[in-house]
A protein has these predicted regions:
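Membrane-embedded alpha-helical segments of inner-membrane proteins
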Residues: 2-164
Length: 164
C-alpha cells in the first residue's frame, strides 16, 4: 500500500495523481484559498482585457465619448487624457495580481503537497498554472475586450480612476 502514495513518473499520470491527492487533502481552508485564487484570476482577466479595451478605442468612439454626458464615459475620457499613466497603472496592477496568484498557488501547493519534489512542483506550474494564467488571464480577456472595448472600458474606468 505504500506504493500508492508514490507519485507516478509519467506526466499525464502525474497530473491525474495530483488531482486525486488534492481532492483527498482538500479542506475548507484550502477551498477558501482556491476561491481567492479564482477571484484573483478574474481580476487578472479584467485588468488584462482593460489594456486592450482602452487602447483600441477608435477616434470615432472617442468623439462619441466627448459628446456623451454619462459619468462612465467621462471617466474613460479622463483616463485616456493621460495614456502613459493609464498604461502604467494597468500593467502594474496586472503584475501585482499575477504575482499574488503565483505566490498563493505556491503556498497552496506547499500545504497540499508538502513532500513533493521540485520536479513535481515544476510540472504543476508548467502543466496547470501557466496555461490557466495565459488563457484565462491574458488571451481570452483580450479577445473579448477587442470586440467589446467600450463596454469593458466603461466597466473598469472607476477602478483605474481609483488606482491612479
Amino acid at each position: 500500500m505504500e506504493s500508492d502514495s508514490v507519485p507516478p513518473s509519467e506526466p499525464f499520470s502525474l497530473i491525474i495523481w495530483m488531482a486525486i491527492m488534492l481532492a483527498i487533502n482538500a479542506s475548507y481552508y484550502h477551498l477558501l484559498i482556491s476561491l481567492v485564487l479564482i477571484t484573483l484570476l478574474a481580476f487578472s482577466a479584467l485588468i488584462s482585457g482593460s489594456e486592450v479595451a482602452f487602447f483600441s478605442i477608435t477616434p470615432a468612439q472617442i468623439q462619441d465619448l466627448k459628446e456623451s454626458e454619462d459619468k462612465a464615459d467621462f471617466r474613460v475620457r479622463n483616463l485616456l487624457e493621460r495614456p502613459r499613466l493609464l498604461l502604467a497603472t494597468i500593467l502594474i496592477s496586472n503584475n501585482f495580481v499575477n504575482v499574488s496568484i503565483i505566490i498563493l498557488f505556491n503556498f497552496l501547493m506547499n500545504q497540499l503537497l508538502p513532500d513533493s519534489s521540485i520536479q513535481v512542483i515544476a510540472v504543476i506550474y508548467a502543466a496547470i498554472l501557466t496555461p490557466i494564467l495565459v488563457f484565462f488571464g491574458e488571451v481570452s480577456p483580450k479577445v473579448f475586450a477587442n470586440q467589446n472595448n467600450l463596454f469593458l472600458a466603461r466597466m473598469t474606468a472607476r477602478f483605474f480612476k481609483f488606482l491612479r
